[in-house]
Amino acid sequence: GYGNGREIRCESTSGRYTTCGYVDRRQHVEIRRQLSNQQCVYGRNWGVDGRQLWVDDGCRAIFVAY
């Protein structure tokens, strides 16, 4: 369920591309709480590349993988 997901904090500082840990390919990842003023949009400034969570262009958020 939603409550037992693993939280991953991922922050793009100075607009830089950043990777933040690994997720299982079967897991669903979504934003739990956005921390940046910049809107985080999936596929544009955050996503999962293979098994790595990434952010870019100032997106900062707490994600949850479950």
Please describe what each predicted stretch is.
Residues G1-Y66:
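Glycine- and aromatic-enriched low-complexity segments, predominantly in secreted/extracellular proteins
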